[in-house]
Amino acid sequence: MKARPLLSALALLALPLGSLPAAGPPAEALAYTCAGCHGTDGSSAGPSSPSIAGLDPEVFMDAMQDYKVDLRNSTIMNRIAKGYTDEQIQGMAMFFARQKLRPRPQQVDPTLVALGAELHDKHCEKCHENGGRPGDAGTLAGQWMPYLEFAMADFMDEERDWPRKMARKFDAAIDEQGDRAIPALIHYYGSQQ
């Protein structure tokens, strides 16, 4: 019977520990749930998903928040984003920002690449610096070309909102080159390693 008071005392001491919130999984573990589409390090292995390695954390967080509240069109990201807290999204954003983008070689048309480089320099470079490499305006360089086609179609079909300046610049590129503008930009970005 003397053991009973000791067990009761130990049980009382353990109560505060049980009431503490459990620490969530680390950001790296959360980020690995993205691997099926975006690659284990954020460099996508498949042509319909964007690479998110090296992405500016604010761009990542803004995109996830937009998915979370259905402001950004997607097949499944809206449902996925709703499963994460703001803190978890921030942790994943920091994880992916530290990763190095590893573009995959793609088949491109050299004539379109050259035209796309000119269009980018004239209309896009100011916001998408260094040829569209990872930065605070998102990553274009080295993205899969089919993904870029889907993203451009979303903008053109008004499934995704254009920033005003981007819409004006894009209209100017289309006025200049017509139907060749979009494929040229896509080939240029897809050509970059």
PLM regions with names:
Residues 23-41, 108-130, 144, 180:
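Sequence/structural segment immediately N-terminal to covalent heme-attachment motifs in c-type
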Residues 8-18:
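Bacterial N-terminal signal peptides
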Residues 67, 95-96, 120, 155, ...:
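Conserved hydrophobic/aromatic "anchor" residues
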Residues 42-73, 78-82, 117, 132-157:
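Gly/Gly-Pro-rich "capping" loops immediately C-terminal to redox-active cysteine motifs
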Residues 1-5:
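Positively charged n-region of N-terminal signal peptides that target proteins for export
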Residues 80-83, 87-112, 125-143:
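Accessory recognition modules or surfaces
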Residues 82-104, 146, 151, 171-193:
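C-terminal capping alpha-helices of c-type cytochrome domains
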